[in-house]
């Protein structure tokens, strides 16, 4: 096959929903990693949480993101990708805005009505609701809106978009932190995903389904999840592998506070996290 033929295959092999979904993924990852790279500093430096409380809250933030993704696919299939993706970006925009507004005066009545740790914990769980819908929608669109001869390339493009957004996020967070203030990092994350709401609303069209496989209910997804965990060997493997990820994610939960407290309080922590 000539280079020209392959180019034509690639040009014609992806439908418009593929490109809309994957471009939106850049900005969703930018928002997520931008917010996550500044979250520990924000909780510890601006909201005066202890190191232990900061670790617990950032761990809750990251843990809920990955846990709720188990059920996000079933919800996305029921709603349809366009509706689910639009809803996800609206939820994320509101969630990131609320995180950056935790210390604002207009939230003072709510802060005073409950322990601050409980309030912040509830707010930090909100982004997980949006991210749990984004992942299955973008991956599902990549599968449905690409022809079979370029589908493998489609997944490569998807992961490239993830990496671009994941690299840009901490860089943007560093700039916002230094020039606008730490709270504004979360406002920029909110604006990024809010813009993607309009991109999806105006340009995304529901990709065609492959086959007539019935949509699973949330209860069926939960049963399947438990069935997967049942084999003891696989469960032991997951427990062991979990230890690796616990250590890995310390770069977002513990490392920022360590650098700020023990190394250099003026260190540009967000830029350090780009190495991830």
Name these PLM-found stretches:
Residues 2-15, 211-239, 265, 271:
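Juxtamembrane intracellular "pre-TM" segments in multi-pass secondary transporters
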Residues 37-53, 253-276:
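Short amphipathic helix-loop junctions that connect adjacent transmembrane helices
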Residues 59-74:
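Central cavity-lining transmembrane alpha-helices of secondary-active solute carriers
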Residues 65, 152-178, 190-196:
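Glycine-rich segments within core transmembrane alpha-helices of 12-TM secondary carriers
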Residues 78-92:
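Cytoplasmic membrane-interface "Motif A"-like loop-to-helix N-cap segments
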Residues 90-115:
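C-terminal ends and interior cores of transmembrane alpha-helices
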Residues 121, 183-202:
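Symmetry-related core transmembrane helices of the 12-TM Major Facilitator Superfamily/SLC fold
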Residues 133-147:
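Intracellular juxtamembrane helix-capping segments at the cytosolic ends
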């Amino acid at each position: 096959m000539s280079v020209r033929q392959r180019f034509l295959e690639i040009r014609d092999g992806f439908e418009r929903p593929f490109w809309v979904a994957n471009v939106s993924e850049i900005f969703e990852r930018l928002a997520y990693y931008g917010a996550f790279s500044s979250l520990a500093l924000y909780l510890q430096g601006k909201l005066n949480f202890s190191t232990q409380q900061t670790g617990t809250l950032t761990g809750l933030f990251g843990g809920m993101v990955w846990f709720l993704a188990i059920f996000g696919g079933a919800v996305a299939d029921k709603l349809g990708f366009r509706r689910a993706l639009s809803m996800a970006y609206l939820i994320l925009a509101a969630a990131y805005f609320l995180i950056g507004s935790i210390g604002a005066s207009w939230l003072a009545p709510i802060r005073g009505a409950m322990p601050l740790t409980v309030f912040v914990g509830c707010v930090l769980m909100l982004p997980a609701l949006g991210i749990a819908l984004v992942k299955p929608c973008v991956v599902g669109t990549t599968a449905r809106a690409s022809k079979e001869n370029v589908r493998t390339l489609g997944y490569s493009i998807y992961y490239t978009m993830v990496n671009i957004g994941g690299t840009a996020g901490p860089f943007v967070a560093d700039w916002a932190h230094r020039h606008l203030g730490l709270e504004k990092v979360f406002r920029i994350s909110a604006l990024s995903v809010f813009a993607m709401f309009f991109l999806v609303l105006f340009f995304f069209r529901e990709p065609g389904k492959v086959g007539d496989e019935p949509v699973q209910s949330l209860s069926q997804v939960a049963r399947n999840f438990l069935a997967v965990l049942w084999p003891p060997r696989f469960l032991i493997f997951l427990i062991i592998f979990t230890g690796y990820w616990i250590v890995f994610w310390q770069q977002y939960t513990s490392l920022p506070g360590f650098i700020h407290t023990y190394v250099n309080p003026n260190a540009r922590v967000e830029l350090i996290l780009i190495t991830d």
